[in-house]
């Protein structure tokens, strides 16, 4: 990765770079420079995340933006494990309280569009660019092609939406749990105004698979923003996630 001169000086010439970290991906690098630890991302998603982190600052706990230049984002290490790694006994309640905090933000103040038309277009582009691996689909979708999933999404599109400021990828790995203080929300390039079920479907899938029905019940109790679950929208947004 080519760093702008200012960012190179900020990080330091002798910094150690690694992709070996929790939630490692090709777009996030962990950088250790003396006593400081940063995460560095680059590209269009880094630019999108930078804008969202700036907006979220002071509204919900998020990592500190250290610097941003030429589509390169430098974020301070929070120094805390994800709820997925820490697996606290009350993980459902932790995730429920944190998502409630996000979903209670006024949608009229959020400048980012996470609505279905924009997300379906992103899904279509992912198929076109060969970025969807059907081998990673949930068990009940094995055997479907990405094109079949997309056609099903178009045919069963919900006619209602309960709009909130949605994370867009609300999984246990994207909520950090410091030893003290509030949980910290990370990886927010997809954040925007969207149906709350975009988040509920994903966290339900992960909690149910890894922690069982009790964790989901504890989540709902702590979240406390819905009186009943719309199972059709839960399924729809889980299906949509296969293409994202």
Go through each PLM region and give its residues.
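Hydrophobic residue at the +6 position relative to the catalytic HRD Asp in the kinase catalytic loop
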Residues: 173-177
């Amino acid at each position: 990765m080519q760093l702008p001169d200012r960012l190179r000086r900020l990080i330091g010439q002798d910094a150690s770079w690694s992709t070996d970290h929790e939630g490692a991906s090709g777009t996030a690098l962990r950088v250790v420079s003396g006593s400081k630890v940063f995460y560095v991302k680059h590209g269009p998603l880094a630019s999108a995340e930078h804008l969202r982190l700036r907006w979220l600052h002071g509204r919900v706990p998020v990592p500190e933006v250290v610097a941003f230049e030429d589509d390169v984002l430098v974020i301070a290490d929070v120094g805390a494990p994800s709820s997925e790694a820490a697996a606290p006994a009350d993980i459902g309640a932790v995730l429920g309280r944190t998502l409630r905090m996000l979903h209670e933000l006024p949608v009229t103040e959020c400048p980012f569009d996470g609505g279905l038309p924009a997300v379906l277009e992103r899904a279509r582009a992912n198929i076109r660019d060969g970025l969807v691996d059907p081998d990673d689909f949930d068990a009940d979708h094995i055997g479907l092609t990405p094109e079949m999933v997309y056609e099903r999404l178009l045919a069963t599109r919900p006619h209602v939406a309960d709009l909130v400021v949605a994370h867009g990828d609300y999984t246990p790995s994207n909520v950090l749990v410091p030893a003290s203080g509030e949980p910290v929300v990370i990886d927010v390039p997809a954040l925007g105004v969207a149906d709350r079920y975009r988040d509920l479907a994903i966290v339900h899938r992960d909690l149910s698979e890894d922690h069982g029905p009790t964790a989901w019940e504890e989540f709902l109790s702590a979240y406390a923003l819905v009186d009943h679950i719309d199972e059709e929208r839960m399924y729809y947004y889980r299906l949509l996630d296969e293409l994202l």
